[in-house]
From Swiss-Prot:
Source organism of the structure: Arabidopsis thaliana
Domain YDG: 149-302
Subunit architecture: Interacts with H3 histone.
Protein name, entry field: Histone-lysine N-methyltransferase, H3 lysine-9 specific SUVH4
Subcellular location: Nucleus; Chromosome; Chromosome, Centromere
Binding site for S-adenosyl-L-methionine: 456-458, 493, 548, 551-552
Similarity annotation: Belongs to the class V-like SAM-binding methyltransferase superfamily. Histone-lysine methyltransferase family. Suvar3-9 subfamily.
Length: 624
């Protein structure tokens, strides 16, 4: 495993007692921020944006002071849904034009996941479709215009977890219809073709006359089947819309994208859709179907020279997961946690000639150990909710989170988006252990495996799907003062708790601009001469949990989230890893260690360098 001094990301500007001069400077900055917010909201309104706040808040007559000058108004309060819409608009202002195509796809899907979870939190019907609608309004669809052939950034084997995800990217723009096609609005661009012209089909097994032999497919056209009942054909199909579009593809030798959908119990939507590449429409005809009605048939042939099909791997992924540890190839440890975790974590090693176990010289623990010279603050008062926190207007913990809950009660709790800091309910709160605002405190929910990799040492992967926003684990070890571990050489498992530094953007760290209320009495000094150095760290060198085996990636699928639950001192925040994307089974779990290049120095003061073997398309080739 690559050597690392891990870095956490964390919260917003901390308030503290300060001089009158400093208070005036801060108030001036807050006033300027309020003015900019008002201007931005008004700009969105002037452009008739669908995602701005209500007009009644924007066009109220400005109040005046006694001297006739206009009073400074606070920016209008926004709901969580409105904030999400504003940030969606701001995040799509053209700054990402230079991103690689696959990174654009990843970012687009993350935006959709956020909108989807916001709609779930707002208890809207069909939150997946509402999420797509919000992206359409914000002009956030990655490929809004239909494209023939492969879409940049979406390779053969790419997995979607819902039809709405495909719509959000612009891969297949019909959430229900199996055939996506260009209508007559494209006639100027495709004047040499007859329209409509098909660009994509999704095979979901809804038609009784379909015949799928992988490379060769007999596809049944659209229309005439019972959508709500047994899916059987109930009337004749017509040669129109998608059916006519496939006919034109056959006549003009235009390939179509083929995506197969399958039931999958471990997927959070119970479905998974795999892109299987481009197919040529070789032939079409009309015939009487199984139910006696006329259906249109299309023979599709997969184009040569494409990567191998992966749908079967997805469809039968459960078959690759052993039912007992005795079936695991290369097993070196049945459970590295020794029964401490709710789900056992096996370890496998098929790399070394003499396989070794990751537990050698390592003690597994489930909770943090605190060094004697580290003083943990007293527990905060907490909220007065009962059972589960549901009313964000009354819950004290929700108020700390900016007036809304950071989690949505879906799939046992999912974080809507990354924040500077998340305030969870703690030991003195009135709610119970099932409260959604205790999501990261719950037991291990996924079947994981520690495995030996060829270049990166030990690594971690999941045997099942992990939905975006799900907590995977907390980084566990011994909490020490950073100054006490600086003399320990070759310790690769030090995680600096630099939430305070990140929230102030110190040392090149990137802030997360979130609406949180960091308490004034956290005891943190912002004027320290050594403010770039975190005061505390987590040492998992010889004692810790499986999080120590999670590797770095320049394009990670996890992110670091600082969480406060038992107290409100961000210097000692809990470090929790959450899923940034919907993660497929057997995919390695990774996060960004956060090193800046040339930031690590040896005992001689010289810059140390370490190669990165993450394998990402945009790997920067060096860890530090």
């Amino acid at each position: 495993m690559a050597g690392k001094r891990k870095r956490a990301n964390a919260p917003d500007q901390t308030e503290r007692r300060s001089s009158v001069r400093v208070q005036k400077v801060r108030q001036k900055a807050l006033d300027e921020k309020a003015r900019l917010v008002q201007e931005r909201v008004k700009l969105l309104s002037d452009r008739k944006s669908e995602i701005c706040v209500d007009d009644t808040e924007l066009h109220e007559k400005e109040e005046e002071n006694v001297d006739g000058s206009p009073k400074r108004r606070s920016p209008p309060k926004l709901t969580a849904m409105q904030k999400g819409k504003q940030k969606l608009s701001v995040s799509l202002n053209g700054k990402d034009v230079n991103l690689e195509p696959h990174l654009k796809v990843t970012k687009c899907l993350r935006l959709f996941n956020k909108q989807y979870l916001l709609c779930v939190q707002a208890k809207l019907s069909r939150p997946d479709l509402k999420g797509v609608t919000e992206m359409i309004k914000a002009k956030a669809i990655l490929y809004p215009r239909k494209i023939i052939g492969d879409l940049p950034g979406i390779d053969v084997g790419h997995r979607f977890f819902s039809r709405a995800e495909m719509c959000a990217v612009g891969f297949h723009n019909h959430w229900l219809n199996g055939i996506d096609y260009m209508s007559m609005e494209y006639e100027k661009e495709y004047s040499n073709y007859k329209l409509p012209l098909a660009v994509s089909i999704v095979m979901s097994g809804q038609y009784e006359d379909d015949l799928d032999n992988a490379d060769t497919v007999t596809y049944t056209g659209q229309g005439g089947h019972n959508l709500t009942g047994n899916k059987r054909q109930i009337k004749d199909q017509l040669l129109e819309r998608g059916n006519l579009a496939l006919k034109h593809c056959c006549e003009y030798n235009v390939p179509v994208r083929v995506t197969r959908g399958h039931n999958c119990k471990s997927s959070y939507t119970k479905r998974v859709y795999t892109y299987d590449g481009l197919y040529k429409v070789e032939k079409f005809w009309a015939q009487k179907g199984v139910s006696g009605f006329t259906v249109y048939k299309y023979r599709l042939k997969r184009l040569e020279g494409q990567p191998e099909l992966t749908t079967d791997q997805v469809n039968f992924v459960a078959g690759r997961i052993p039912t007992s540890t005795s079936e695991i190839e290369g097993l070196v440890c049945e459970d590295i946690s020794g029964g401490l975790e709710f789900k056992g974590i096996p370890a496998t090693n098929r790399v070394d000639d003499s396989p070794v176990s990751p537990t050698s010289g390592f003690t597994y623990i489930k909770s943090l150990i605190i060094e004697p010279n580290v003083i943990i603050p007293k527990s905060s008062t907490g909220c007065n909710c009962r059972g589960s926190c549901t009313d964000s207007k009354k819950c004290a913990c929700a108020k700390l989170n900016g007036g809304n809950f950071p989690y949505v009660d879906l799939n046992d709790g999912r974080l809507i988006e990354s924040r500077d800091v998340v305030f969870e309910c703690g030991p003195h709160c009135g709610c119970g252990p099932k409260c959604v605002n205790r999501t990261s405190q719950k037991r291990l929910r996924f079947n994981l495996e520690v495995f030996r990799s060829a270049k990166k040492g030990w690594a971690v992967r999941s045997w099942e799907y992990i939905p975006a926003g799900s907590p995977v684990c907390e980084y566990i070890g011994v909490v020490r003062r950073t100054a006490d571990v600086d003399t320990i050489s070759d310790n690769e498992y030090i995680f600096e708790i630099d939430c305070q530094q990140t929230m102030q953007g110190l040392g090149g760290r990137q802030r997360r601009l979130r609406d949180v209320a960091v308490p004034m009495n956290n005891g943190v000094s912002q004027s320290s001469e050594d403010e770039n150095a975190p005061e505390f760290c987590i040492d998992a060198g010889s004692t810790g949990n499986f999080a120590r085996f999670i590797n770095h990636s320049c394009e990670p699928n996890l992110f670091v989230q600082c969480v406060l639950s038992s107290h409100q001192d961000i210097r000692l925040a809990r470090v929790v890893l959450f899923a940034a994307d919907n993660i497929s089974p057997m995919q390695e779990l990774t996060y960004d260690y956060g090193y800046a290049l040339d930031s690590v120095h040896g005992p001689d003061g010289k810059v140390k360098q370490l190669a990165c073997y993450c394998g990402a398309l945009n790997c920067r080739k060096r860890l530090y």
